[in-house]
């Protein structure tokens, strides 16, 4: 039996939905590194990463605090994304032997001076967490969930210390976590004698260690030795942080066999328990899309069938003059807007951001940008932004040529430099603030130079290549002729005033994404993993459709009011959703974050301005192209003498 077109479509639609369902229901990813097999007794080297805090958002090098240092500190080779995230991966004194439990090992003994005491206390006040890595797995603290269930969750890193008071005293003291109890989970290969690491947990403790006589080569502690089985007892005295005090850093390690396979070892870190919220968000957004789709369908039916057929049947000039609405402005609707060059720049930049976002999400859906590939997401976004410059140049030049613009080189330079120039200016100010705080989040000179090389050496030339290709193409022709004398725009009702209609237009696109936005902001500012790109991709598609449809609907109402200045209005209508995004970021700052430092607050709002600006350019471009297609469609269907 011959397969029909309809059945073919249903087959491919089913295939697509099956793939999306799999992507949504599973933490689907490709591990970023090849598995390593360990034999019993093989050395395991723990690496240390940055100190991080959700209260300050300022990462610091692990050895900024007076922790135990190896004889020579070696920096791990970091990719571009890791450097931009503030990661500083280095070697440490913590070494294990595979499958060999070690009850107590002494790391070092340090004496606190004024500076180190001050630094420890500041980091305890700001709730800093120390981060470590073993076989590319970050260390985590196992916690009971707060919802009362028996399930557990992972907290990334461990607290530097805590504040408390002795029994019978109200004076608050600072205590440091100087003893780390590590637990390494492994999965044994049944065919060979090797094992693979599938988990890395830590339980931090504060212990005031005691010893009779300190032997640097073989220190013997009375509170901790190789025969100790249970270190932590009810009467253990915690280690206080005070100038002049000695701190002995110790650790122990145990190994536990796990049923988790190496390919699934990241699942516990990526465990998401909010699927119902995401589905509710998507269903809610789809209802908005269906409502808007109905309106667009009615408009298209009316304009392309009823109105156009009636309009084409008009024979006398008197009948034509009696017509009102969008048909009357056909001689002005394609008149180039004010600041047409600037509009071309923003549309070209929006295409660049759209291409970067789409390809990044496709790579993430396929599993190439998993958290195990540390810094991969950030690196991919930067590189894709650079290579999408060719589409920015092409889009802006095509529009510029249609507007009969001149000085194409100036136009191309604006496309290449305006948006990234504004971003770099804000970025430089923020980076200077981070430098002033001596944070490892400050971008080093070498990385900054590499970013400039990517911008000037690859992105700018590609914008010129795209612009050259665009200008070589014949100009886009208007479906109707433009009158020499502009038509006067009649007085508009209050609800069609530009400010009101633009602000109204941004509500629905923002409403389509704001629940997913909460999870994205949480992952950025509360140091959590975000890896539900299946949901994000669906929300992105809904955002595209919502921006397009709301712009088309409001553009139609505008043309019916005989206002033909739709070019910038279309861009700003969808782009105004960024205004609500920034308002939401203010709400999020005051309700979800505990940032108290001025510098940290400036960093937050600086980065949110960058995100909101990029969102404005992206959504504005989507709305503009939808309206551009709509206007050309309806006026190309009308016969004009």
From Swiss-Prot:
Keywords: Endosome, Golgi apparatus, Ion transport, Membrane, Signal, Transmembrane, Transmembrane helix, Transport. A motif (Endoplasmic reticulum export signal) lies at residues 630-635. It holds the Pfam family EMP70. It is found in: Endosome membrane; Golgi apparatus membrane. Ubiquitous. Highly expressed in the root elongation zone. Residues 300-348, 396-415, 466-499, 553-569, 619-641 are cytoplasmic. A motif (Golgi retention signal) lies at residues 639-641. GO terms for cellular component: cytoplasm; endosome; endosome membrane; Golgi apparatus; Golgi membrane; Golgi trans cisterna; nucleus; plant-type vacuole. Its main location: membrane. Residues 28-278, 370-374, 437-444, 521-531, 591-597 are lumenal. May play a role as effector of cellular copper homeostasis. Belongs to the nonaspanin (TM9SF) (TC 9.A.2) family. This is Transmembrane 9 superfamily member 7.
